[in-house]
Amino acid sequence: MAIKDIADWVMSDKTECTQFIRDLLNNPEALREQPTICELHGHNWKGKADLITTDETGQYVIIDFKTTSGNPSDFNKWTLDSFGYNSQAYLYKEMYGMNFKFIFIGKKPKEDSKGKVYYDVCEITPSQDTLDMGRTRVMEALEQYEKYYGEGATEDVRASYTKKVI
């Protein structure tokens, strides 16, 4: 299904379950595609938040929209880890200094009992456990980066090159 079809479904006034997404997007104070650059753990990082807005409690929050071929309501902390979303959540929380939420929208259209098309939608707020796992993954990545590219590099990236035909 085309992303335009999903966007049209989300933005339709007839789609009650996505009213909260429309409210976030239509907030006149929301900042869209907000870039940032910062230093974190001795390295420069850049990011671009899809949306910075206020949530239902009035707190500023970063919203990142994702489409997925899986069923978003089946996601768990291991799914977030396998796609690196925990690292993204950790980095954005550190870079922007505010909470973070993902809104996942399934790509596969489904039909309800009346034949009406819908998509799975799931809002995920990373737990402290997930953020901690993200921090661990970021630190592991920085360790690898330092090993091959840092000032005191101990490995040559060209020596780890493998070429195969499978």
Feature names for model-found ranges:
Residues 41, 56-59, 111-114:
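Short, solvent-exposed loop/turn segments that connect beta-strands within catalytic domains
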Residues 47-75, 92:
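Conserved catalytic cores of phosphodiester-cleaving nucleases, focusing on short active-site segments
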Residues 1-48, 158-166:
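Metal-dependent nuclease catalytic cores that hydrolyze phosphodiester bonds in DNA/RNA
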Residues 23-28, 53-60, 94-100:
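Secondary-structure boundary elements
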Residues 37-39, 71-80:
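Surface-exposed cleft-lining segments at the edges of enzyme active sites
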Residues 37-39, 52-54, 105:
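A generic structural motif
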Residues 79-86, 91-166:
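Metal-dependent nuclease catalytic regions and adjoining charged, substrate-binding loops involved
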Residues 44-46, 60, 119-121:
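Short, mixed charged/polar active-site loops
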